[in-house]
Amino acid sequence: MRSAFYISDGTAITSEVFGHALLSLFPTEFEHHTISFIETTEKALAAKERINKATSRGGKPALVFHTFVNNENREIIESCDAVLYNFLEPFVAPLEKELAIKAKPTTHRTHSIHEKSYDYRIEAVNYALTNDDGSNVTNYEEADVILVGVSRSGKTPSSLYLALQYGIKAANYPFTDDDMEELKIPSFLKPFHKKLFGLTIDAQRLIDIRDGRMANSKYSSARQCRMEVREVEKLYKNEQIPFINTTKLSVEEITAKILTETGLQRYKY
């Protein structure tokens, strides 16, 4: 299997994101490797050796997606027996010309703990954990968004992803079996109606998920799952709560759609 490397003298997050995005366009399997914090000559040489071995083992040149601030270490990597893609180089010179200023590359600047976005994200993660699954309903005034939906529709992972990636304070509240007889917005959520965002899911997918968690129970029964999905979607429509179906979406896609629908400010950068 052909190898793909994502490497950097920083976190390698940028290389991973761009590299995976490009490779996802092709119906081919790859053996993925991430090497971060290549900050010394020794580490660069070790990475080069690893890449060359992967090329030799796979029979085809490894693909290397990289971002380097240090020119010497970049040159070592670029001498590998591999096909290389430098994500920064094509854009730096045109930007320098447009901005009329020379770039001053600094490692870790994008993902530094000294950035304000880091503080936003840590605070948002703490908020998401404290306000997960309706465990705390007393401080929704701090929420940027409140995700609602039936159990196992994707509320918790979406809340945490919004917090960790974008610094958005996302609470979430579940509609349970006890709510279904006369489903309505709870009194403590009514003052925050504009913050509500609904998640729904196809009944069959919900059955499959719940069956893996609590097989042969009322909770995972087809009748229960279909009823809950039907009632919660009726509530969304009656109360004009925006909502999306999460059945075929990854957590990245779910949160991207939430951000698009709500227009929430991102604190990532």
Swiss-Prot record:
User: Which catalysed reactions does the entry list for this protein?
Assistant: [pyruvate, water dikinase] + ADP = [pyruvate, water dikinase]-phosphate + AMP + H(+); [pyruvate, water dikinase]-phosphate + phosphate + H(+) = [pyruvate, water dikinase] + diphosphate
Annotated residues for binding of ADP: G149, V150, S151, R152, S153, G154, K155, T156
PANTHER family for the chain: PYRUVATE, PHOSPHATE DIKINASE REGULATORY PROTEIN 1, CHLOROPLASTIC
Keywords, alphabetical: Kinase, Nucleotide-binding, Serine/threonine-protein kinase, Transferase
Question: Per its record, how is this protein called by name?
Answer: Putative phosphoenolpyruvate synthase regulatory protein
* Statement: the UniProt record of this protein carries the keyword Transmembrane helix: no
Entry EC no(s):
2.7.11.33, 2.7.4.28
Q: Does the keyword Transferase apply?
A: yes
Single annotated GO MF: protein serine/threonine kinase activity
- Domain of life of the organism in this record? Bacteria
Q: Which family does it belong to?
A: Belongs to the pyruvate, phosphate/water dikinase regulatory protein family. PSRP subfamily.
InterPro entries this protein is in? Kinase-pyrophosphorylase, PSRP
Q: What does this protein do?
A: Bifunctional serine/threonine kinase and phosphorylase involved in the regulation of the phosphoenolpyruvate synthase (PEPS) by catalyzing its phosphorylation/dephosphorylation.
The species this protein was found in: Colwellia psychrerythraea (strain 34H / ATCC BAA-681)
